[in-house]
From Swiss-Prot:
Family: Belongs to the iron-sulfur cluster assembly SufBD family.
Protein name: Iron-sulfur cluster assembly SufBD family protein MJ0034
Alphabetical list of PANTHER family matching this protein: FES CLUSTER ASSEMBLY PROTEIN SUF, UPF0051 PROTEIN MJ0034
Pfam families for this protein: SUFBD_core (PF01458)
GO biological process, one term: iron-sulfur cluster assembly
Length: 316
């Protein structure tokens, strides 16, 4: 298969995660495009270094944003699997030097979703007063025979900002197992949001730990999701307030329907008497009044439930 044909397959795959896949693949902006276990395209730009190589059955990628460079347009990483029974293993290192800023959009699309493993190990280093905005969009097809396991370690220097949004709300999930550890220095800001919509026998596991080690560091962790049918969602979210005036909040809102199960374990740890960490969780069925209002407009119960759930997780 030619490179052109492979890029066309990638375009078809990421239609599920982007409204303009052609612009991502053929545009002028920085990007890394991976299909199965092969790097199809790497494009850098002034102020940013993008490197990628295939080694020992893995994809190894590195992104370095040079000091002072602030990118107004997003950088794209595309990971596509268009075949069945494929393992895709990726090691990624992302470094933002002092006073730099980027928005990175990661498109992970596996439309056939059968016998697939997508394993990602990430290291992120955010320099002093740098800002990293990361948006990750997934589509896993309709079979559910898939394992996705991202493991990420983040270090944030003084005044650094880390914004992370993970979205998997269309199709099946299969098994999703997220592990993330974040260490924050003075005046760092962290904002993490996870959105999932689990159906049938899908399984979601999220384990996130944030250590506010610097004075005045701040963090919010948000989870928005729904567990339907026989699916299971397990959330273990932890914030440590280890320094004076550090502040953190955990906010979980999950809907359960059918024989599904949601477990939410917020953990707050305070090791300084000037720190403050809080949490709240709301888990339950769809609001009956909202349901009745929509059904009165002609929707059946399943249609009304889907609208309420997707409105809650921000997918409308």
């Amino acid at each position: 298969m030619s490179i052109k044909e492979e890029l066309m397959e990638i375009i078809e795959a990421i239609k599920y995660t982007s409204e303009k896949p052609e612009e991502i693949v053929h545009g002028k902006g920085p990007r890394i495009i991976v299909k199965e276990s092969r790097i199809i395209d790497v494009q850098g730009d002034e102020g940013i270094i993008l490197e990628g190589k295939e080694e020992d059955g893995k994809i190894k990628a590195k992104i370095i944003v040079k000091k002072g460079y602030k990118f107004k347009y997003p950088i794209h990483m595309c990971f596509g699997i268009t075949e069945e029974n494929i393992s895709q293993i990726i090691d990624v290192e992302i470094i933002l030097e002092e006073d730099s800023s980027i928005s990175l959009m990661s498109h992970c699309s596996f439309p056939k979703g059968k016998g697939i493993k997508h394993i990602m190990n990430g290291i992120i280093k955010i320099g002093k007063n740098a800002k990293f905005s990361y948006n990750e969009f997934h589509y896993h097809g309709m079979d559910g025979d898939i394992l996705v396991k991202p493991t990420v370690k983040v270090e944030i220097d003084e005044g650094g900002i880390y914004i992370s949004n993970f979205t998997l709300t269309k199709g099946r999930i299969g098994t999703l197992d997220i592990e993330q550890e974040i260490i924050a220095k003075k005046d760092a800001i962290i904002d993490i949001t996870t959105r999932t919509y689990a159906i049938k026998e899908d399984v979601v596991k999220v384990n996130e730990v944030v250590k506010l080690n610097g004075e005045n560091a701040k963090c919010i962790i948000k989870s928005r999701g729904a567990a339907m049918d026989n699916s299971k969602i397990s959330l273990k979210l932890k914030i440590e307030g280890n320094a004076p005036y550090s502040k953190g909040h955990i906010d979980c809102a999950e809907i359960v329907k059918g024989n599904a199960e949601v477990e939410s374990i917020p953990i707050v740890v305070v090791r300084d008497d000037k720190a403050r960490i809080t949490h709240e969780a709301a888990i339950g069925s769809v609001d009956k009044k909202q349901l009745e209002t929509l059904m009165a407009k002609g929707l059946d119960e399943d249609e009304a439930t889907e609208i309420i759930v997707k409105g809650m997780i921000g997918d409308l």
